[in-house]
From Swiss-Prot:
Keywords: Chaperone, Disulfide bond, Membrane, Metal-binding, Mitochondrion, Mitochondrion inner membrane, Protein transport, Translocation, Transport, Zinc
Disulfide bridge map: C35-C60, C39-C56
UniProt key word Mitochondrion: yes
UniProt motif (Twin CX3C motif) ranges: 35-60
GO CC aspect terms: mitochondrial inner membrane
Family in the record: Belongs to the small Tim family.
Domain notes: The twin CX3C motif contains 4 conserved Cys residues that form 2 disulfide bonds in the mitochondrial intermembrane space. However, during the transit of ddp-1/tim-8 from cytoplasm into mitochondrion, the Cys residues probably coordinate zinc, thereby preventing folding and allowing its transfer across mitochondrial outer membrane.
Source organism (scientific name): Caenorhabditis elegans
The protein, known as: Mitochondrial import inner membrane translocase subunit Tim8
GO biological process, one term: protein transport
Gene Ontology molecular functions: metal ion binding
């Protein structure tokens, strides 16, 4: 980047941050699809969830939260503390 044009630098940083947000959103959608595939293997949820399915969903959501927190922390470090 050309340090002589701070407005261009700011724009490029914002563009990079938005691209990273989009990638993160895509990853969340991918993980959601995977959780669905794992917890509802037959692609249709039962009329009433059993304990096994509830545990599966809970574990999957917890892993998604862990992944989300990791990604936010990683992006924050990459952006010098600004997400």
């Amino acid at each position: 980047m050309d340090s002589a044009d701070p407005q261009l630098n700011r724009f490029l940083q914002q563009l990079q941050a938005e691209t990273q947000r989009q990638k993160f959103t895509e990853q969340v959608h991918t993980l959601t699809g995977r959780c669905w595939d794992v917890c509802f293997a037959d692609y249709r949820p039962p009329s009433k969830m059993d304990g096994k399915t509830q545990t599966c969903i809970q574990n999957c959501v917890n892993r998604m939260i862990d992944a989300s927190n990791f990604m936010v922390e990683h992006l924050s470090k990459m952006n010098g503390g600004h997400v």
